[in-house]
Amino acid sequence: MTLKEEFPVLGMGCAMCAARVEQALRAQKGVAQATVNFAAQTVLVQYDNQACTTSQLQRCVQAAGYDLVISDNAAQAEEEAEQARSKQWADTRNRTLLAAALSLAVWSIQMFLTPSLPSALLMWLLTTPVVAWCGRSFYANAITQLRHGSAGMDLLVATGTGVAYLYSATVLCLHLGFGHGTALPHLYFESAAMIITFVLAGRLLEARAKSHTTDALRTLISLSPHTVTATDDEGRTWEKRIQDVSVGDLLLAKAGERIAVDGSVTSGTSCVDESMLSGESIPVDKEVGSRVYAGTTNLQGSFTYRAQCVGNHTLLAQIIQMVREAQGSKAPVQRLADRVAAVFVPTIMSLSVLTLIAWGLLGGADGWQRGLTAAVSVLVVACPCALGLATPTAITVAIGRAASEGILVQDAAALEEACRTGAVVMDKTGTLTTGHPTVTRAQWNGDKALLGPVLMAMESRSTHPLAQAVRQYLTDNRLTLSPQSAVLTPDTCSTLPGMGIEATIHGTAYLLGNRRLMEQRGIRLDEPLAEACRQWESEGHTIILLADGQEALAILGVADPLKATSKEAVDQLREMGIEVHMLTGDNDRAAAHTAHEAGIGNYAGNALPADKAAFVKHLQSQGKHVAMVGDGINDSAALATANLSIAMGQGSDTAMNVAMLTIIGSDMRQIGRAIRLSRTTVRIIRENLFWAFFYNIIGVPVAAGLLYPLCGMMLNPMYASMAMAMSSICVVANSLRIRGRGSRQA
């Protein structure tokens, strides 16, 4: 069986490390695809569990010089990886502090003491632990990379500092043996020490910054409680581990507690904060029969609920898995960075050697000395990490931000595609409207306190959606009981197919149905009711009439009302320069009314599923990137045809499976927010890539000595390493801006 799982990876230090892990896994038998998210330090693997096991995947990664965290529980694997990273971070911090103290001493000797043999020996003594202990990971990783035929950032740092240290130690030893009476040679101990210090400090800051890119995912994971209060029909309660909860268990939700699993309320009422799912801050009322979801918060009162979805089947678990997979995917814009990163280190190594040779041959008397300085600077100024982090950090932050606002992104490509949207096509029913027939108009030709219970009696046994709408209206308006507080029961009741219901209640015959039934039975409709019929029908309402044997007694108008956020959402899209179209299978009159209410000028009714897909293609033929928003099976063809497919989370599974973006709640404004988030993310990715390329394009020539003929300036390797460390930190920091801007700003 083919599985898709995400695993934490330990030991990756740069983009080349990520590429090496990908290559190792893709070469493993049974692995169809492997995608590393360097920013999140994870790998998404699609593999056949009959052809290879997770242990084989782990051994494969370990053979490449890294480690894969394997666990039966995703949360446990993440916790183990986090513990390992925390331990590694603490070790790096300790080595950085020691390196900083020793390097500062070496730098002070170099700057303030007169060059002498004792000062040179002291610098050698202080630099040795910096190189041998503080910087040991660079050399160990470099050796591993060479052994496996790869090259990464550690190889550049190890080569640069190793050359500086070994050269200085060698010439100092030669001076001790053969240089008595001669001038002390130029030494690079402070360069070797400071390079390691700055790179370690940069890694430390970068790791802390990168940890914030997955804050949203960690927040989602933390929403699930570890224990839950179980109960039984006799009211006894006991604590239960979340892993031990089974479908059908009766659970108790106390005020202020998080709900443990998805279920249905069996007793009690409350209101629940579902903002973590839908992004909507207004609490949702819950009563018997209401659905509740894992991770949401019970705000007041207590209620019991029956577990329906547990473990990885809860909505929260599915959201977490979707966010993991999306964060692990690669955006198309990342391909250029990947191609450059693949040849980056060999190219820099070659340029460093050429720099040394060019200075040695053309630089005059001290050409080789300057050449060594320039060669080391070239090695340490170059930064493939900035290129490797440019896209995944922004994608990871953006997808996490989207999830926290109730927007699920299928993959990075969807996020990139959304920014190009020029036209949005919306379905009407369930997308712009609530999808639930509701009585929105009522006019009575008699005492409604007497007629309401009659209506309730006639509709009480019907399962028709219109009957449900009428019952809900009567219940909400307290019109279900007679003045004697009794529930009326029909003496006789029969269905008239296509027209309505005929019933006798307390000896009086009643009709309930459409205008055709009234006309067929010769029921008189006085002018106020007739005018109301005409007016409401022009607004797209379905008309229901109640009559006795002679005249109409009441008229109800049933409609699918517009969602409260639909008009604002349409206005926002238009302000963003996006065309808005509406298509519906309803008649033209209903389509026109809804479009007018929503402020949509382009609409069409009587549209079949094939018509919707054809309309999307028509817009695409005009060169427009089209987003389709739908919620039902009849929208799936158009969703699949569109450049960007958006499903409303309360719709069908078919629509959500096809969609690239899913809006969990019913807030239509999330569509504009998703597009704004995409625009912000793509802009920041471009900024990151520009600065990463610009930094290397400018930094490498300057390090090689390009400015020396113009102004006599050579880039000190110490400052080159500082610039390299800052380049990665700046890329991560720029990506983290999405957390503060995201979907709220264009």
Predicted features along the sequence, with ranges:
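Actuator/coupling domain of P-type ATPases
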Residues: 62-80, 120-123, 127-227, 231, ...
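Conserved catalytic phosphorylation-site environment of P-type ATPases
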Residues: 277, 336, 373, 383-458, ...
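Conserved ATP-binding TGD loop and adjacent catalytic N/P-domain core of P-type ATPases
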Residues: 2-3, 19, 505-507, 547-687
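Bilayer-spanning, highly hydrophobic alpha-helical transmembrane segments
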Residues: 97-105, 335-363, 375-383, 388-393, ...
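Conserved cytosolic catalytic loops of P-type ATPases
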Residues: 29-51, 55, 186-189, 218-313, ...
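Signature of the cytosolic headpiece of P-type E1-E2 ATPases
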Residues: 103, 466, 476-593, 608
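Flexible metal-binding regulatory segments at protein termini and peripheral loops
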Residues: 1-119, 210, 219, 236-239, ...
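Membrane-embedded alpha-helical bundles of multi-pass transporters
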Residues: 112-116, 147, 166, 401, ...
